[in-house]
Regions:
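Hydrophobic alpha-helical transmembrane segments
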Residues: 97-111, 337-352, 407-416, 499-507
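Extracytoplasmic/lumenal acceptor-recognition loop(s) of multi-pass membrane glycoenzymes
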Residues: 54, 59, 65-72, 79, ...
């Protein structure tokens, strides 16, 4: 009963969080409707082969051949035996709430746990949770289907809570919280978000260090640091399978360093990603005002005509054009919405800079500034270049605008510290009232100025790209159209300026009423909570709203099979590939749903495959389209051996070509080399450049090009004859079986993508795989009849799983110790109480 009484308010807060989360998604959650997310819909084909194989065999394959000729599944909803336990524990943490509802719930709960670790009272912690959880970006990523990112962001605050507890001297609680939530965090599988939050932790640890130096408590600081490190290591160990294989995979992807030596390296980073690619989505410098004013740049990249209020100012003559023009006019190529942290929250943050004391304030300010500067990306390249070149791992991630998640954490936290300071020391509103006015002026004042004089501060309401596009219109339309467009967008901007202004005015009124003792602390907190919740709720409903939810059957219905799909699927060959020339080949996974595609979409495709796309596959696609069209689809009139040899070596058996009216037609490729073949010769080269260049200098059906480092595995082949045959007799995505007949032996090339971890056996005896033609597997066999098996069951999986289960044992032991210590402490407390 005492325990229940102690935590009753916390339990009530958790219930309120669950109610808020349910209400946001009403009536969709009551109707059983689900969110139709483009990113999730696009991933159907990506994981379809993996899912089918699991349904049929009960086994999880770590390889699929459905996209990009073949790639690991480590970053396709990764699942390991060790993480299944974590999945069940996280469901309990979510209170088994339904999808979408629990996303918001864990946002709220996570920040609440952290603020309680900072020793905030329940009501203040609840308010802080609301203003953090309802930051617009967190709802935008739900709408976009970036669910791993949602999970990662939700688990970070409670992980930081463990760090805070450790540095406050509560070592065991800090250790357990750090271990559990770092395990949750790593399991969420969004390394980019975790990496960004490490900057926050670094700044906070520095603040704790400064405090320890001032108090002469370095020993205590060292102990707390050790506790945090041990907790993190336990959390990491539970996810070692996922972490290790993600790291290993990363070395082979576009995020790993290329072996090619490029002539123009100025745009390259050490990670292998181009600077332009990394910074493509960079926040505009003046776009940073969205933190205070959500529609400072128009909001999301949706048709302007969808904004009914703004269209009241539209010239009827241009309504059709406004269907094509976006509401957003910022620097990014496009956006699903702005980063808005709350207008009154911004004012409290500024106030916190004035009245909060101690190193933690400076740590949060430094992290905020860093986040904003890095979010500018290509708009502030000297600073960005420094991080790309010298800060470990920073160049591994693109979409630099998303680093604003740091500011979305630090701004609400310092804002809540300011409010806590006011409640703990009410006299501060009297003694430092000028600082309140200054904070009001620096936020509401700017909103007012922008609303009254938008063109003075923001002269550009039309992007450079839009200006160029509009110049294609007749000259007599350009002036009136651009003038009307500016007027519409000004109205969007000024409307939100006034909105933020009044939110800050109302919030400031709560502070003044508290100063005048017309409101108690709890009533002030409740009023601010309602104000901020309504403010941010309304903004979020612009980007995640009920009409986006559809009947569950829409998502679960299998992808519709086209006539082209049906024709190709009549081919009962075990394994062949399809090239869809009627789609955006390397930006879609629909083809992969029913076929093994040459194309696909994945943000981390294998680097060598991408390099082959750039050097050979993309040029061959253009030549193929032209040649097949000129031949009227008659492949006997197409010189396939010379026009598309790389596609042939990838066993591209079918091309899908576009027809008028959106229809498609399949064309069979008679030149495809098949699943495997003997070559007459292996031509060895000295480096990756010579290897990729050599591919189009030989007849790939008879000659293989290999890096000299594979000479020991492959040796040399011999001239073949018609009796040399390689036939696939069994296909599984992670296990391929071939029947080989050859009187001469030699090197067999497989039309399968080379990747570390694949093993080969000949008649049950292991042989070493080599890599040829830049991306394919090969082995050398002796004369005779053989059974060759290629298998992908990496030994590293067993090793990392063993470590993970040891980690579970350590964590369970710590939990038992923690419970024992708590029971002992309570007994001691009760004994003292009874004596008194």
């Amino acid at each position: 009963m005492k325990l229940l009484k102690k935590y009753l308010l916390d339990i009530l807060v958790v219930i309120v969080f669950a109610v808020i989360s349910f209400v946001y998604f009403m009536p969709a959650d009551m109707d059983g409707r689900i969110l139709f997310r483009h990113d999730s819909a696009a991933s159907k084909g990506l994981g379809h082969e993996k899912e089918l194989f699991q349904q049929q065999t009960g086994e999880t394959t770590r390889w699929t051949n459905s996209v990009f000729g073949g790639m690991p599944t480590y970053q396709m909803s990764p699942s390991y035996g060790s993480t299944q336990v974590l999945s069940q524990v996280t469901k309990a943490y979510h209170l088994w709430l339904p999808d979408y509802v629990w996303y918001v719930f864990v946002y709220l709960l996570g920040f609440y746990i952290m603020l309680r670790a900072f020793d905030f009272r329940q009501s203040l912690a609840a308010l802080g949770s609301i203003i953090w959880a309802f930051s617009s970006y967190f709802f935008i990523i739900i709408a976009a289907g970036h669910i791993w990112k949602v999970w990662a962001l939700a688990y970070l605050p409670p992980m930081i809570a463990g760090v805070v507890l450790a540095y406050r001297g509560k070592y065991l609680k800090g250790l357990l919280l750090t271990a559990i939530f770092s395990a949750f965090e790593v399991n969420a599988n969004h390394v980019q978000m975790t990496y960004y939050y490490l900057f926050i932790i670094l700044f906070m640890v520095i603040a704790f260090l400064v405090d320890a130096i001032k108090k002469g408590e370095l020993a205590r600081f060292g102990k707390a640091t050790a506790v945090c490190v041990v907790g993190a290591l336990i959390g990491i160990s539970l996810n070692l399978s996922n972490l290790y294989h993600t790291w290993q995979y990363g070395q082979e992807t576009m995020r790993g360093k290329s072996e090619l030596v490029k002539k123009n390296t100025a745009n390259q980073t050490s990670s292998g990603l181009d600077r332009d690619y990394i910074t493509q989505w960079s926040y505009g410098i003046d776009e940073t005002w969205t933190l205070l004013i959500p529609d400072a740049k128009g909001g999301a990249s949706v048709p302007l005509a969808q904004n009914t209020q703004a269209m009241e100012k539209a010239d009827p003559n241009f309504v059709q054009i406004y269907q094509q023009l976006g509401q957003y006019w910022g620097n990014q190529p496009g956006t699903s919405g702005p980063v808005y942290v709350g207008a009154f929250v911004c004012m409290l943050f500024i106030l916190g800079l004035f009245i909060v004391k101690g190193p933690m304030k400076w740590a949060l300010l430094a992290a905020t500034i860093l986040s904003i500067l890095l979010s500018w990306g290509r708009n502030f390249m000297p600073f960005t270049d420094f991080f790309l070149d010298y800060i470990p791992m920073y160049a591994k991630f693109r979409t630099v605008a998303s680093i604003l998640v740091i500011a979305e954490f630090t701004i609400p936290l310092l804002a809540m510290m300011a409010l806590k300071k006011i409640i703990d020391e009410p006299e501060i509103l009297t003694s430092k009232i000028k600082l309140v006015y200054a904070s009001f002026g620096l936020t509401a004042g700017f909103c007012l100025l922008f609303a009254l004089m938008p063109s003075v501060f923001f002269p550009d309401f039309i992007s450079v790209q839009e200006t160029q596009a509009l110049q294609q219109l007749p000259a007599e339309y350009q002036g009136p159209l651009m003038s009307n467009l500016i007027e519409i967008r000004k109205s969007i901007f000024t409307s939100d300026c006034w909105r933020s202004f009044w939110v800050i005015v109302i919030g400031s009124a709560f502070l003044l009423f508290y100063k005048m003792k017309k409101l108690g602390a709890e009533y002030m907190i409740a009023g601010i909570a309602v104000l901020c919740l309504v403010d941010m709720w309304m903004v979020n409903k612009r980007y995640l709203y009920d009409d986006m939810f559809v009947d569950k059957n829409v998502r679960d219905t299998p992808q519709q099979m086209t006539e082209t799909d049906k024709i190709i699927c009549r081919d009962k060959a075990l394994d062949y590939r399809v090239l869809n020339l009627a789609s955006n080949t390397f930006n879609e996974n629909e083809t992969s749903y029913y076929h093994k595609s040459i194309g696909g979409y994945h943000p981390a495709k294998l680097r060598r495959y991408q390099e082959m796309i750039d050097a050979h596959i993309a040029p061959e696609m253009q030549k193929t389209m032209k040649a097949v069209a000129e031949a009227g689809g008659d492949m006997t009139k197409v010189n396939g051996d010379s026009i598309f040899p790389v596609l042939n070596m990838l066993n591209t058996k079918y091309f899908i070509l576009p027809l008028q009216g959106g229809q498609t037609v399949p064309v069979q490729n008679p030149y495809a080399y098949g699943n495997a073949w003997f070559v007459d010769e292996v031509q060895y080269v000295n480096n990756a450049n010579e290897e990729i260049d050599g591919v189009d200098k030989v007849n790939l059906r008879h000659v293989a090009v290999a890096d000299a480092k594979f000479k020991e595995q492959l040796a040399q082949s011999v001239k073949q004859d018609d009796t040399s045959v390689v036939k696939m007799i069994q296909y599984k995505p992670n296990n391929l079986t071939y029947e080989v007949k050859s009187s001469k032996g030699g090197v067999i090339v497989f039309s399968e993508i080379y990747y570390p971890g694949w093993t080969a056996t000949v008649d049950g005896q292991p042989v070493e795989l080599g890599r040829v033609d830049y991306i394919l597997r090969a082995i050398n066999v002796k004369p005779g009849n053989h059974k060759v098996v290629l298998d992908f069951h990496p030994q590293s999986l067993k090793n990392t799983e063993m470590v993970a289960y040891i980690g579970y044992g350590v964590l369970v032991l710590l939990i038992i110790i923690g419970i024992g210590v708590e029971i002992k402490k309570r007994k001691k407390t009760d004994a003292v109480s009874n004596r008194n």
